[in-house]
């Protein structure tokens, strides 16, 4: 993956200025690119202090042969939604973690992505951009290089990156759409559980009721921040815990995990700056749940 810029003004006096202003490359990555001779001026590797002139061509090779040495390569079936030189977007099933852990050392999604990269001849670090809980399904994005990862995380921080979820929750809403703005913190004496707390970090969830019966609602949730368990905590706090969420509500005979699915993402592609949008269907367990309880099929 390559960045290219043709100098068209006299404002810039050196390559460093161009790379920071035009591409917003971090100092850390810039240092790494220079050491690896991945920055070229008119096809010649240079230092960023080199001066520039009108019509000079600056190119930056963003790809490195590097691996996540602590991640084991494991063959698995990946549901690939989209792939290009900088991105891999998957539809993650429930019941699989994104990152390896002591309990999931070889069967996380990252293990499968590493195997996939190796199978197509790529040596890359595994760089998940967004997070999904073990029992949350849906769209998950992996960056193929540090530049794309940094750019997308920055978009999340600037609220340019859109993430939408479908949740099935208990009860019905008096207000069919709204914004939940309640800070979230780690619950005292718990490693996993979160709670609404005035001492927590800002957490904002936008919601819209799509379908409902007397006892259940299908809700679209848009994250304006990205706190751990944010939708689950917010919905539980306002009296509408997710169906099947044993941590913030109660388990259910209708579904064996929390009924939460990331069905839509939209962001600006870091190199072309085109807006990319992706969606995926509900998994079978949630589709059946909605048919049974809401007497309607969401699609």
Report residues per predicted region.
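RNA pseudouridine synthases
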Residues: 1-179, 185, 285-289
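Structural detector for hydrophobic anchor residues on beta-strands
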Residues: 165, 180, 205, 217-219
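Short small-residue beta-strand/loop micro-motif enriched in glycine and branched aliphatics
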Residues: 96-99, 192-193, 217
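Short, surface-exposed secondary-structure edge patches
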Residues: 47-51, 220, 257
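Pseudouridine synthases involved in rRNA/tRNA modification
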Residues: 1-32, 76-78, 204, 209-214, ...
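Short Gly/Pro-enriched turn/cap motifs at secondary-structure boundaries
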Residues: 130-131, 196-199, 254-257
């Amino acid at each position: 993956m390559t960045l290219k810029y043709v100098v068209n003004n006299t404002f810039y006096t050196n390559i460093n200025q161009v790379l920071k202003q035009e591409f917003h490359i971090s100092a850390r990555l810039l240092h790494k690119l220079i050491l690896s001779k991945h920055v070229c001026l008119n096809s010649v590797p240079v230092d960023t202090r080199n001066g520039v002139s009108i019509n000079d061509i600056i190119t930056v090779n963003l790809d490195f042969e590097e691996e996540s040495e602590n991640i084991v390569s494991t063959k698995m079936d990946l549901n690939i939604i989209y792939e290009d030189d900088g991105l891999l977007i998957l539809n993650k099933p429930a019941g699989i973690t994104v990152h390896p852990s002591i309990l999931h050392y070889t069967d996380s999604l990252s293990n499968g992505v590493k195997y996939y990269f190796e199978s197509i001849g790529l040596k890359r670090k595994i760089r998940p951009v967004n997070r999904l809980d073990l029992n949350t399904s849906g769209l998950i994005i992996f960056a193929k290089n540090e530049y794309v990862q940094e750019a997308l995380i920055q978009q999340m921080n600037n609220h340019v990156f859109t993430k939408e979820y479908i949740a099935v929750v208990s009860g019905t809403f008096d207000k069919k759409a709204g914004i939940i703005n309640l800070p979230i913190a780690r619950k005292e004496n718990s490693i996993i559980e979160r709670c609404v707390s005035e001492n927590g970090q800002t957490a904002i969830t936008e919601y819209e009721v799509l379908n409902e019966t007397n006892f259940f609602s299908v809700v679209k949730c848009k994250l304006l921040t990205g706190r751990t368990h944010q939708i689950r905590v917010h919905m539980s706090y306002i009296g509408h815990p997710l169906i099947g969420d044993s941590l913030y509500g109660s388990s259910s005979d209708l579904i064996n995990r929390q009924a939460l699915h990331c069905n839509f993402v939209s962001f600006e592609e870091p190199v072309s700056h085109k807006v990319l949008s992706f969606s995926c269907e509900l998994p079978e367990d949630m589709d059946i749940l909605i048919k049974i309880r809401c007497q309607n099929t969401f699609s």
